[in-house]
Amino acid sequence: MANDYHEPASEMTKKQREIVRAINSLKEEIEAVDWYYQRVAVTDDKELKEIMWHNAEEEIEHAMMTLEWLRRNQEGWDEQMRTYLFCEGNILEAEEKSKEEDEEEDKKDKKKKSK
């Protein structure tokens, strides 16, 4: 087994090691998608192209399941996913829009509390 740690694993909790495991799995799934994508891009055989694209889609599914696990289990993922995934318009402007929406919600909450 390769050493996936940059810090001593013995100093990490079980949960922290599970998060490292998930992140490494996610990296492997994304790498597999990349490899299949490249193979699909260069093959001339239609049937082989379809098979490899099917394989790539399976790897994408695995990556998404791992992302969902990370969202549920490591702080930070949920907020970032809510900001950037499925947003409309310019992706770079999504953060600013999210901040504005948060400020509006904070104002509403303050009004409710003051009543």
Language-model-detected regions and their locations in the chain:
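Iron-associated oxidoreductase/ferritin-like identity signal
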Residues: 1-115
